[in-house]
Amino acid sequence: MGNFIITERKKAKEERSNPQTDSMDDLLIRRLTDRNDKEAHLNELFQDNSGAIGGNIVSHDDALLNTLAILQKELKSKEQEIRRLKEVIALKNKNTERLNDELISGTIENNVLQQKLSDLKKEHSQLVARWLKKTEKETEAMNSEIDGTK
């Protein structure tokens, strides 16, 4: 019986396909792609520093530092969001696995109860048949006594 449960759990895990998890994965991929694009843009900003002259260097540097600070904050918030989404995905996967385990145990319990019901119905039929035979014999005995006294 233990092997049956393990086999059922393995089958449930293999058959598991959660569209919500797939969409979460797609969202994660899109956000990682956005992050890569922003990093590439940040690299472009640092490469274009050679053509500045005199006072423009300071204002250009300030603009780059501002942009860098903004992008770093955004990157940090996106990384936190990614971490949070990964935790949500892990929790949902755990809940899904727990639900599948409950379904499997419920199915097994249902099968056991169905077998018990079948056995009890069979036993009931046998008891009714024995009782009817006994009652028939008693009736025949009474009838023979009545016929014998007449």
UniProtKB/Swiss-Prot annotation:
Effect listed in the UniProt record for changing residue 108 to A: Significantly reduces autophagic activity
InterPro entries on file: Autophagy-rel_prot_16_dom
Molecular functions (GO terms): identical protein binding; protein-macromolecule adaptor activity
Coiled coil stretches, renumbered: 58-130
Disulfide pairings: none
Superkingdom per UniProt: Eukaryota
Pfam families: ATG16
GO CC aspect terms: Atg12-Atg5-Atg16 complex; cytoplasm; cytosol; nucleus; phagophore; phagophore assembly site; phagophore assembly site membrane; vacuole-isolation membrane contact site
Additional observations: Present with 573 molecules/cell in log phase SD medium.
Protein name (record): Autophagy protein 16
Organism the protein comes from: Saccharomyces cerevisiae (strain ATCC 204508 / S288c)
